[in-house]
Amino acid sequence: MSEPNRKPKSSAALLQSRRNALRSYLGAYGFMAPAGVLVLIFFLIPVAIVLYLSVTNLASSNFTSDLAKMEFIGLKNYRTLFNDQFARKIFFNTIFYVLVTLSLFNVSLALIVSLLTTHIDRSAGFVFRALWILPRITSPVVYILIWKRMAAEAPFGILNQFNELLGNPTYNYVATNPWVFVVVVNGFIGVSFGMIIFTSAIESIPKDLLNASLVDGSSRMQRIRYVILPLIRWPLLFVVTYQTLSLLTSFVEIQLLTDGGPGLYRTEVWSLTAFHRALSNYFGNAQWGYGSAFAVLLVMIGVVLAVIYMRVFRFDELVAEPRVEAL
Amino acid sequence: MEIRIDNLTKKFGDVVGVEDLTLHIDDGEFVAFLGPSGCGKTTTLLTLAGIYKPTDGLIRFGDRVVNTVQPKDRNIGMVFQSYALYPHMTIFQNIAYPLKLKKTPKNVQNEQVRQVANVMGIGELLDRRPGQLSGGQQQRVALGRALVKEPDVLLFDEPLSNLDARLRLTMRGEIKHLQKNLGITSIYVTHDQVEAMTMADRIAVMNRGHLQAFDAPDELYDRPKTRFVAGFVGNPPMNFLDVEVSPSNGHFLAQADSIQLPLGAERGAPPAGHGGPVVMGIRPEDIQIVDEGDVTGEIFVVEPLGREDLIDARVGPHGFILLADTEKQHRAGERVSLKFDMTQAQFFDPQTERSLLWRQ
Ligand SMILES: Nc1ncnc2c1ncn2[C@@H]1O[C@H](COP(=O)(O)OP(=O)(O)O)[C@@H](O)[C@H]1O
Ligand SMILES: [Mg+2]
């Protein structure tokens, strides 16, 4: 409130305004508290524990659940990791896996499915999208078993049974093309997320705008290029960001399909290594400390990537200005 | 461009958008589609634009049947109620978009966009985005975008409905002026009869997917061919009254309860010949409050409109809307004598709702 002749505020008024400020401050934190508690319990505390484990040599041979009794070894695990001859290979495996799956499936195929199913009859589009959600909602074990059955060696594999029927040579598909299978199997799961986001973004573009483009002289392809894609730019960037991070940390399907093989670390990715080292070492010795070092680096990579994405894609603008309104 | 629509039907599943519409529009003509919400105006317009495929019937632009021609190959400009500007493009890019799609050279694009922008008075706004413009400015941009490609046909879908009343009045004049200057065949969809009456050469009145009338504005007003048209065109709307018309010593008499109104042969003979009850229509401006009138009644409500008073007068069970000079200072409850100008009365068949005076 502005008064015409401003007098210095009385101390009572000053106290009152401080009290109001405090109240709105507490109100804001009150609303954030439930989410904050979840982040604390399920993210910050586990990160702190893993961080601590990564500077101990905790393993099955010297196991203890007492944090105080664990043996502190400084950065030795990290030194071992950087000198590990396979860590380099696993690192590039991870980049390859994330980039290829993301670009071919989680973004491109998701976009193609969304565009196709929004350009055909509504209910047919709905059915196709529902089919694409199946890999996501099927339990990973069942889903991977289906793929394994499909691709198994003769005489068990379905594909190979066809090969035999047709008199073609048979293949051990997964063993000969492990990366193709790892990418396709994960890609099929990854399509649904982008598909749902892109479809709802496309469907929220006002009909008038889409009609206007056709009347203005665009073909349907030109309308996608000049109107639809620019208008779903933010959902696109969001899916790229979110799916990069989610692919970085996913390993269950790879574990079930190839378990990082065949051979030494052919399809091993970083998050799977963390699991292997910490919980399922080939040599029967679970190295929790060493595995934690892998996990800590993964968290750091994830956080750095998230920050880079937010900077490059300027998500702060998205939050600052209601873009949706302009649609 | 001459447009001929023959027996056009467009259905969405079981829902009828428009049915059996036949309409021939002359080259350079300004035609309004007038009708209440949901009567099929937009459906017809989008079918003409090529967004919807006709379920049945023929649409011809000139001699070319365009039923299956893609929108981009029809050379039409369209203006939407929501403006439909591309939010991610600048105003310049919005107007240039149709030219870009036609692969017009950049320098020609530049020139034409600036020219159109100047005509529309938006030359200074070219670097802005649609979100930074007022509604009126956005509608000018939309109009500019429709005009820049020099279309053969202009389609308007309630372009002024989202503007305030003052702006609507200005834009009404400007659109009409532009259309006459450019001579582009135009179809203008509106539910506002004042817009239709003031702008159009001819008005197609639609109701529930059917064409009710297609005539010049004064024809529709003076010689409505259906009861719907009579009631829809004109503000305040026409009064309707169930009457019996019978000959009475050389004249005719329209009767309803205590009301008795004398009629000349020109207007009286057809309803009398029809036999049985008919619907009489009389416009508010054709009823006067006088000292010695045809009937006496009581004023029920007075609504001041500024220039005049809108009066709801009751005669027995029948109500009439009429207009009176504000200086007379009529008050509710006042007893008044009403004079009906029966040379302007309309008569309709109560079943078919067709006019008994004007045959289709
Ligand atoms: N895309 C559509 N799908 C189904 N029904 C529609 C569609 N478009 C319009 N309709 C129906 O067709 C009728 C006419 O609608 P419309 O042409 O939009 O009316 P108006 O523009 O005169 O208000 C309405 O009953 C409407 O519900
Ligand atoms: Mg409409």
Where in the sequence are the language-model features?
Chain B
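ABC ATPase nucleotide-binding domains
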Residues: 30, 71-228
